[in-house]
């Protein structure tokens, strides 16, 4: 079910429900655009109701680091960023996963909890800016794909 005030996503568009009528639902996006959603869309499209099970949501940001990086330092920095961010919740506490030994990087995922799904894009962007800044301050490189070419004579 959808109620006024819910944050929903349908067909890739996210909005806060403002009004529900017999034929349409009106929602407003984070950039203040009005979505008019025909109610039949709920039957033919996948609907995500971000507030259906409460207001606590989980999000994540992934980042890769150079293979020469101290992985414990990466974990410490990522947790510090999450702990100090004003829009992230302290409980449940943020977590860092060492996801993979990637082709070009050691891959990590910062998982966090927030209570305003309407700000998710801004929160994730803000965290990425902070990761870039903190990694730069600590001389941690975010690698890019590289290839070694061996030439035979």
Where are these regions (language model features)?
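Solvent-exposed, non-transmembrane regulatory segments of membrane-associated proteins
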Residues: 49-50, 65-69, 79, 83, ...
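Soluble accessory domains appended to multi-pass membrane transport proteins
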Residues: 1-90
């Amino acid at each position: 079910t959808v109620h006024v005030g819910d944050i929903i996503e349908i067909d890739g568009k996210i909005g806060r429900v403002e009004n529900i009528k017999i034929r349409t639902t009106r929602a407003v996006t984070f950039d203040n655009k009005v979505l008019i959603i025909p109610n039949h869309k709920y039957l033919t499209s996948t609907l995500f109701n971000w507030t259906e099970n409460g207001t606590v949501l989980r999000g994540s940001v992934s980042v890769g680091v150079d293979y020469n990086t101290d992985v414990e330092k990466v974990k410490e920095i990522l947790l510090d960023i999450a702990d100090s961010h004003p829009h992230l919740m302290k409980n449940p506490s943020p977590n860092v996963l060492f996801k993979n030994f990637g082709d070009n990087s050691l891959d990590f995922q910062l998982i966090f909890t927030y209570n305003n799904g309407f700000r998710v894009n801004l929160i994730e962007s803000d965290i990425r800016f902070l990761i870039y800044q903190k990694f730069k301050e600590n001389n941690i490189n975010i690698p890019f794909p590289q290839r070694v070419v061996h030439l035979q004579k």
